[in-house]
Regions:
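Acidic, Ser/Thr/Pro/Gly-enriched interdomain connector segments
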Residues: 1-34, 39
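N-terminal, helix-rich and Lys/Arg-enriched segments in bacterial and organellar proteins
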Residues: 16-20, 45, 64
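Extended, structured, electrostatic nucleic-acid-contact surfaces
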Residues: 21-30, 45-55
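Extracellular LysM carbohydrate-binding repeats and other cell-envelope/extracellular binding modules
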Residues: 46, 51-70
Length: 70
């Protein structure tokens, strides 16, 4: 999977946002809109902290694996 960070856009962002929402991390009032903005950044950091990952706000290999249950 592609690394995602603030400013990323597209289908993979929408997938990551959907998985974050399913795991109880709100991505803001627009939900899974495919735009990695401030609300998604906060959701990623919250999720990473909850999973004991480095809370860098980047959806990289470790965060993808956790989101996908791998």
């Amino acid at each position: 999977m592609t690394m995602l960070s603030k400013g990323s856009r597209g289908y993979q962002v929408k997938v990551a946002q959907s998985l974050l929402i399913l795991n109880g991390c709100s991505c803001g009032s627009y939900g899974a809109d495919g735009v990695f903005g401030s609300a998604t950044l906060s959701a990623v950091r919250k999720y990473q902290r909850a999973k004991g990952l480095a809370a860098d706000g980047i959806v990289g290999p470790n965060t993808w694996n956790a989101l996908l249950g791998l």
